[in-house]
Amino acid sequence: MELELGLRLALPSPSPSPATATAAGSELDLLNSAPGSCRKRGFEEALGGFKTDDDNDDGNGRGGDGDSDGEMGNKRRKLVGWPPVKCLHRRRDGGCGGGYVKVKMEGLAIGRKLDLSILGSYAELLDTLHLMFPSTNQEDGHDRRRRHPYAVTYEDGEGDWMQVGDVPWEAFAKSVKRLKILV
């Protein structure tokens, strides 16, 4: 087994054994070289003389030769990943249209996700939230308070926090980013 793989612990001798004779010449050269002469290859050596587009780059994003408004300034650089696919799909589909939103309840460390596209009204949303986060508060009071004992707020597309029910359902479903349940 040791001879088939060409593995051994001793330093290589000037006359290689038949098992190591099948090894590539470059590997033998590395083994027989003087200590300290082995080094890692540089970037240019590893690429084998391959020239990249940004070899003349001076780090300022315009290219090498210092032309600020020259040839390189007029060329338009292609952005990788542009346009963002997620935004493109949203625009094509006509907005968010009630996809998944994150739902967090005050006092709980773990949130959940809710698909707004299967819901059609605020009443369905509140019932679903009540099933997702059951309340232990069994106070007597108003019928709505007993049925939904917490306030629900949402963050819209502009980053403002608003109370659920302030805008029509369609506008809410298109603008909501996340929901927060306040106890």
Curated annotation (Swiss-Prot):
Record region (Disordered): 1-23, 42-77
Subcellular location: Nucleus
Main location: nucleus
Pfam families in UniProt: AUX_IAA
Sequence motif EAR-like (transcriptional repression), location on chain: 3-7
GO CC annotation, single: nucleus
Induction details: Highly induced by auxin.
Tissue and organ distribution: Expressed at very low levels in etiolated seedlings and flowers.
Keywords for the protein's UniProt record, in alphabetical order: Auxin signaling pathway, Nucleus, Repressor, Transcription, Transcription regulation
DNA repair as UniProt keyword: no
Biological processes per GO annotation: auxin-activated signaling pathway; regulation of DNA-templated transcription; response to auxin
Subunit text: Homodimers and heterodimers.
Function comment: Aux/IAA proteins are short-lived transcriptional factors that function as repressors of early auxin response genes at low auxin concentrations.
Xref: PANTHER family: AUXIN-RESPONSIVE PROTEIN IAA17, AUXIN-RESPONSIVE PROTEIN IAA29
Entry similarity comment: Belongs to the Aux/IAA family.
Protein name listed in UniProt: Auxin-responsive protein IAA20
